[in-house]
Amino acid sequence: MIKKLQTSLIALVVSVFGFFSVPLSTASAADCSVHIGDFDWDSANIHTAIGAYILENGYGCDVQVTKGSTNPILAALIDNQIDIIFEHWTDNNVQLIDPELESGNLVFLGVNTPASEQAFFVDRATSEKYNITSVEDLAKPEIAMLFKDPENPEKGRLTSCISGWTCYTINLVKLKEYGLDDL
């Protein structure tokens, strides 16, 4: 647990990237070994690469990175096989993450991209021209036809997450709940 806490504290400092233009420690790799979990999307890869670089070059840590899909990496983190992840979309795994946070097994260190949201978006010009102000407006047939599905022109099409990602499944449920699954 102490090692996990030390790693968590290092990660907190690492998140303030601007401070690390020169090495801040004379610690050797023997003093610091960190196993980072990385995911299969670009922004996570960037965050992991920056964090790994800082830990290796700024702290002299021995860094191992394991890349994989969300569920296996989270399972390894929860099982203490991985020390830290630098990006996670917690809304997609609330049932898995919240109990681990509550038990103290995982520590949330902060948000690295505060403006990131998961939502349905329409550009301003289209929104203003057709008075689209909420997701419910997308259920109107005349609005749905603005976003025709080229494979089925009788229906509208929304762009979602990559098939296989948790957010894809979440969005399927949302579409059904909003009454958008048959449009």
Locations of regions flagged by a protein language model:
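Positively charged n-region of N-terminal signal peptides that target proteins for export
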Residues: 1-5
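Bacterial N-terminal signal peptides
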Residues: 8-22
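Sec/Tat signal peptide C-region and signal peptidase I cleavage site
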Residues: 22-29
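Short, well-ordered beta-strand elements
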Residues: 30-43, 61-66, 154-159
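Short helix-initiation/N-cap motifs at beta->coil->alpha
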Residues: 41-42, 62-76, 182-183
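Pocket-flanking alpha-helical
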Residues: 48, 68-104
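Ligand-binding cleft/hinge of the Venus flytrap
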Residues: 51-59, 137, 142-183
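A conserved helix-loop-strand patch within extracytoplasmic ligand-binding domains
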Residues: 105-160
